[in-house]
């Protein structure tokens, strides 16, 4: 199970749960059950979420996992208990992965192929590669029927409107750290292209596959599905794509100088208690002797 597709399902579930309801509840569908559902429907063509739920309701999986009542209530437009809402969110995430997993991976390949690294003596907002990725994201937003704003080539804003006044800010970034191509060699001697996504086993290799172009992809596809399925949104969503996260960090402050700060803010490339670490993580602890003051 590759990382980006896990994130695609998770992001859809998360955004759907934030969008419409405020009651907290624990989802009852386990990772093991999710894996079985994905495997069962991996070769099945799904057209829309309701069709997917209808097919799932007729399967032994729904009976075994007692999902029938939740699915029936949703399809009949009945009020759902908090636990049922979370089950629907999780199923929506699984549906998104089944329907758009390959497309999302292809989009990630296209974004990774754009070498959005910092250039000496060239501001990010004048860097040709950032102008290129801005156009790519703009075209993608248009294809997904999402709103797009380019804030002076500093931040790219992709938004999905809801009925309320509150705004949920989803943060990702388009810039990546520089690469040393000769270091991109696997233990078996395989030479990799840093700006070409290479899938080996259950791992994707390529600069930005984790940090953080996958965050752009999963958020936009999650917004696409929410739009397609016409989910009721009590909050507005704004995906804020930073261009300076790996360098000066001045793009987001520039954005907030000219735009309101969202009511809620989420970073897709790290969140407590889980944080993505591209090359491993570590904790440094230091002690210093106390010196008496004079």
Outline where the language-model segments fall.
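Short beta-strand-to-loop capping motifs
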Residues: 160, 288-290
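Acidic/histidine-rich catalytic neighborhood of metal-dependent amide-processing enzymes
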Residues: 208-284
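Gram-negative bacterial Sec-dependent N-terminal signal peptides
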Residues: 1-25
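Well-ordered beta-strand positions enriched in small/hydrophobic/aromatic, beta-favoring residues
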Residues: 9, 155-156, 266, 286
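Polar, glycine-rich mid-to-C-terminal structural blocks
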Residues: 293-294
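Acidic/His- and Gly-rich active-site-bordering loop/insert found
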Residues: 38-44, 48-205, 228, 233
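A short, gly/pro- and small-residue-rich
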Residues: 186-192, 280-288
